[in-house]
Amino acid sequence: MKYKIEKNTVQETLIIPLFARKVCSELYPNLYRDETAVRLIEKIDYDFSEAEKNSRGLMQRFGSLEVAMRQNDLAWEVRDYLKTHPNAAVVNLGCGLDSTGRSCDNGSCKIYNLDFPDVIAVRNELLPAGDREENIPCDLNNTEWFSKIDASGGAVFFASGVFYYFLTEQVKALVQGMADAFPGSVLVFDAANRTAVKMIAKTWLKSAKIKDVGAYFAVSDAKSELSPWDSRLQVTSRGYMLGYNDLRDSSVSGFFRFLAKVGDDMMKMQIVKVGFGGRK
């Protein structure tokens, strides 16, 4: 029995990025593999013909490479933290149908997937929680969810493609709250500068009827811009297209490597890592 997805629903907004991760796995098999996305797409009753057609253009294929690199980079940071904190909480903020937590599972960590209640309802159908895993319905800006995370063994939080839709003040409040609640933990997320965020916003701001793009979270120099938020923050960043992988693979053209460099250097596409020091 396939899981039917209707057009113009919350479910549809979840399966488009899922489909993108499947396409990434096909286009760049040496660089990225999301078995869960491939498997879930098979279980879904939905007309993917338009998404399939749209996925094969030049810039769409580069967009797929962006998705692949972002997921790989965040997973690298999660695994790196687990090396020194094997019993940590691995927390996916704004998880959608992403299975990065599972792909990083070391057999002893605790996995938490957080998103809005209507999203978690779909996730529970398609990706029910496994061992040491919990799907938590919440609004990330309402910090009641803090109490549901067992961070006794440390915690690594990650957000993929999430904070572009947050106001700068919302990200700041969340980071400050996390510094209070989770000393010794780490938050990693992707970010970009104002120019890039304006380009991202073009698609969704029209429907959201939001005028002031400038209020939305964007970063050029993460260390100098975010460190003043709180004295306990240790902020580092690296380019998310080429900062973790040189992309010297037969599936990636020289033109795409050039675009990747433009993204990292001119758009400041980056993975930001925020370490939370001890309590004040």
Task: Label every PLM stretch briefly.
Residues F157-F158:
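A conserved beta-strand element that flanks and buttresses the S-adenosyl-L-methionine
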Residues K198-V213:
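Short, glycine-/aromatic-enriched active-site segment of Class I SAM-dependent methyltransferases
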Residues V213-Y240:
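Short alpha-helix
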Residues L233-F258:
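Conserved catalytic loop of SAM-dependent methyltransferase domains
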